[in-house]
Amino acid sequence: MSAQNTTSRPGGRLPAHALPERLSYEQAREFARSEDPAVRAALARHPDTQPEVLYFLAEDSEPEVRRAVARNDQTPRQADLLLTKDGEDGIRTDLAAKIARLTPDLQEDQRSTVYRLTVQALEVLAEDQLVNVRRILADTLKDVAHAPARVIRMLAHDSDLTVAEPVLQFSPVLTDDDLLSIIRSGPIQGALAAISRRDGVVGDLSEAIVQSGDELAIAALLDNRSAQIREETLDIILDKAPGVESWHEPLVMRPRLSAKAGRRIASFVAMHLLDKLQQRI
């Protein structure tokens, strides 16, 4: 079967975008040589198209064809890696969405060629100049327990908060040491607040956040009922709290306040908050 015969329209024959349900290798090669980009794009979308044909189509001159390759779950990782450098922003965006979506189902085997190439592709995309590409990775991988650690750390250090924030707040891949390193590095505005909102912030992280002096991050920390704040760390907060009104209500609502802390809070909060405090201690 030739591409020319299959794609001719007169006499009720298949339109250019329609291909047989099952494709032989010879048919796929013939369609790949078609002068009609709609045929090549249909081939790039086809679930039966062989990996080597998809790799060939990944270098097609038509963006429509390359985008179809980027979106195809059957595309070999070698072709995906090639497309990470594509000049079309939309193609890299679609590629990022696909690879990030497939990553949770990937077997974490460092010896696997597929795993290694997937990590390489993710690392390239995590440094993409287009914020939306990096944001797609962060949003999709933020709660994936087995996401590649280096990729997650790259996203966590991103210079754009919309990329870094979801990973900093939710990723189980980041260790306490990773988070301490980020806190001490003087990250972008909003990064510490994202860490403060994590579930189960440990005492050392809370102390580092408080030592940073970031008022928004400290407010978020106080508002996080699952965050561990040691008494000595709370004392540092209380030393500055009279002049920071945004801390007052979350301080009043902190779980397990000591009598000493309660007395200090009572000395500076407004009357309506004092009533709440008295009901709690």
Task: Set out the residue ranges of the language-model regions.
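Alpha-helical scaffold segments
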Residues: 1-281
